[in-house]
């Protein structure tokens, strides 16, 4: 790919893999536009068939995005615990109105498919991003990933299932 982080990662990998060899990392000359090798959709090299992609994803999701999130409620509840979401202004307000409050209710997830992109929005997207951040905190040796609220492998596995699901 053409972004600096990817190029620098390639250079570091090559230097670590073969420190005594002068391995050149190759990228396309124009780093201001997407590389078709890594981004064939964004560069228009190919396009998605919206109906087929949607059907395939929903089939894999269990029929709908609601089913997809429904099957992962245990993991979402664990994420809510780490985030202290029940104490958020939104949930406290809903509690006063005798309404339930969850990430999946507050941020409904939606599948978006176009000729050049597929994305999941809402709680699914947020959960994937946040759990990856927690994983990076752990990998970087931070003493208390997730504000110190992730303490055992079961919690890690549960949370990372949200990242892996997307």
Placement of each model-derived feature along the sequence:
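Signature for phosphate-centric chemistry
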Residues: 3-166
